[in-house]
Amino acid sequence: MQIRALVLTAVALAVAGCTSVTVRPVSASVQLHNVCIVNNPKVIVSDFVPVLRDGFARHHIATSVVDQSQAQACVVTVTYTALRSWDFKPYLSHAELRLWRDGMQIGFAEYHLNGKGGYDLGKWRGTKSKMDPVIDQLLATQNGG
């Protein structure tokens, strides 16, 4: 009986707690209306930018995608990185969002699968289902939040 309980506990620990989310939301004193998403050509998660744009749109914030050279013309920018891992098929394993205004960071969000998800079958969920809650926490103080 003790072995069975030990095995069940080990499985529960392997599956639970696999995702880590850290968010420093944008202050309520900052109202965002338009944000430039600085394109990161190193990111190969094909649906990441569309998910990001949808998330900002949910909070009534317009976005445009710009290259690094065009970012200086923007008042507020968001930079991002996203990594994928493989286990039978690719999945999002890490992402970071940083919001900037006048060279100062005004928000930060990180999604991370600890141990690349281990046995957690949720690791194969889509980018949208993983990032929507993270974006919503980041922008919780904004119009749509």
Question: Where on the chain are the PLM-derived regions?
Answer:
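C-terminal/domain-edge helix-coil "capping" segments
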Residues: 19-28, 53-57, 108, 112-145
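A short, hydrophobic beta-strand-centered structural micro-motif
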Residues: 65-84, 90, 96
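A structural "domain/chain start" motif
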Residues: 2-10, 14-62, 143-145
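Amphipathic beta-strand/beta-sheet edge segments enriched in Tyr/Trp
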Residues: 89-115
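Solvent-exposed, acidic/flexible segments
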Residues: 41-49, 88-90, 120-131
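Envelope-exposed proteins and targeting segments
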Residues: 33, 59, 76, 93-95, ...
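Active-site-proximal beta-strand/loop segments in catalytic clefts of secreted hydrolases
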Residues: 40, 68, 81, 111-112
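Structural recognition of the beta-strand scaffold that forms the well-ordered cores
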Residues: 36, 65, 107-108
